[in-house]
Amino acid sequence: MLIHPQFDPVAIHIGPLAIRWYGLMYLAGFIMFLWFGRLRIRQPHMAARGWAARDLDDMLFFGVMGVILGGRLGYVLFYKPSYYLTHPLEIFKVWEGGMAFHGGFLGVLVAMWLFARLRQRHWLEVTDFIAPMIPCGLAAGRIGNFINGELWGRPTDLPWGMIFPQAGDNIPRHPSQLYQFAGEGVALFIILWLFARKPRPMGAVSGVFLIGYGGFRFAAEFAREPDSFLGLLAMHLSMGQWLSLPMILIGIAMVVWAYRRQARSGEERPVTDSGA
């Protein structure tokens, strides 16, 4: 049995300014996005499509806005709509916590659509480009969850079960944050990076991301404690699982569509449409 280390959520104090670990994890995710994005630009099939370093800076700006706005609205709409309906001003108190990945994901999709319009590229061409880097941010975020001792797992008698003092029950639980770090972070990054190293039909990389994230998240939810204010929903599945199922189905459909489209076109190289 292990006990959570109880890290100080504040990493650095600079005068009256308190820099929290969770904020540093966001920063780490953005830095990794830029780092691996520059490596991706150097891949021959990406360079041939005209991707440049300045695109990364703009994509990061749009992406950050999408994550923050979408993540917050997703939490409000998916998890606590009735509460925020009666306390609308609480929606703006982002510093008090309350972000949802699925909402942030939708926010990023909208942001990348706007970026695609600005750059006169196809939306799926943009999402295919960024998909391999997204797990970097997911991995950093899960480490932030673990440092904060939040989003702990369900009770377990496994040797690596961990007591999270914030849970208030002194029961060993799955360190589900680390499961998600390993699955939707590390493993998904490796899968996508290797898959995207070669030219693929437009939409295929995005589809593999949806399948991979949805699958890893769906599996991890069996070890993660459901939100106390929601519990388990229909068929004893959590909200995270119900939101992940459409991602898996849409991802499968996208991969099938992408390869069928390529086969119909008779092209040996992937299709790269222009225009939004």
Curated annotation (Swiss-Prot):
Catalytic activity, EC: 2.5.1.145
Protein location: Cell inner membrane
Coiled-coil features, chain-numbered ranges: none
Pfam family, one: LGT
Entry's transmembrane regions: 17-37, 59-79, 95-115, 129-149, 176-196, 202-222, 237-257
Role noted for this protein: Catalyzes the transfer of the diacylglyceryl group from phosphatidylglycerol to the sulfhydryl group of the N-terminal cysteine of a prolipoprotein, the first step in the formation of mature lipoproteins.
Family as reported in the entry's similarity comment: Belongs to the Lgt family.
Protein name per UniProt: Phosphatidylglycerol--prolipoprotein diacylglyceryl transferase
Organism of this sequence: Cupriavidus pinatubonensis (strain JMP 134 / LMG 1197) (Cupriavidus necator (strain JMP 134))
Organism taxonomic ancestry: Bacteria, Pseudomonadati, Pseudomonadota, Betaproteobacteria, Burkholderiales
Gene: lgt
